[in-house]
């Protein structure tokens, strides 16, 4: 009776180790992906990695108005938030397959 229980436990441990390995690989692949957030009809673009690092900010020359720096700041902020939202969506779709049915708090895949 105990032997069967130990065999099941070993199988469960192997499955957990495989899942951890698969999750680590998916997390690594996520970091290699990029998303693009935009604002102002593409006047400001922010590129971020799958690990939520802003990699690049592009600002079209025609949006730069020394008399209205606040508008430019708002566009950069909006583009950054758009990029980070897309990273969350990418993360949820990539990592969510590992956490289905676990009832983790929001934002945790």
UniProtKB/Swiss-Prot annotation:
SUPFAM superfamilies tied to this protein: YbaB-like
What UniProt keywords are attached to this protein's entry? Cytoplasm, DNA-binding
- Which is an annotated GO molecular function term of this record? DNA binding
Q: Which cysteines are joined by disulfide bonds?
A: none
The listed locations are: Cytoplasm, Nucleoid
Instruction: Tell me which GO cellular component terms the UniProt record holds.
Output: bacterial nucleoid; cytosol
Q: What is its main location?
A: cytoplasm
The record's annotation in Pfam families points to: YbaB_DNA_bd
Q: Which family does it belong to?
A: Belongs to the YbaB/EbfC family.
According to the record's subunit comment, the protein's assembly and interactions are: Homodimer.
Say what the protein does.
Answer: Binds to DNA and alters its conformation. May be involved in regulation of gene expression, nucleoid organization and DNA protection.
PANTHER family membership: NUCLEOID-ASSOCIATED PROTEIN YBAB
Q: What is this protein called?
A: Nucleoid-associated protein BcerKBAB4_0019
Q: Which organism is it from?
A: Bacillus mycoides (strain KBAB4) (Bacillus weihenstephanensis)
């Amino acid at each position: 009776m105990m032997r069967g229980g130990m065999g099941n436990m070993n199988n469960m441990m192997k499955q957990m180790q495989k899942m951890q390995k698969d999750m680590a690989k998916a997390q690594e692949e996520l970091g290699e992906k990029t998303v693009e957030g935009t604002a102002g009809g593409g006047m400001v673009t922010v590129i971020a990695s799958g690990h939520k690092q802003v990699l690049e900010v592009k600002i079209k020359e025609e949006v730069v108005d020394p008399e209205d720096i606040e508008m430019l700041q708002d566009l950069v902020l909006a583009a950054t938030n758009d990029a980070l939202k897309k990273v969350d969506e990418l993360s949820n779709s990539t990592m969510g397959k590992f956490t289905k049915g676990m009832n983790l708090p929001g934002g945790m895949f």
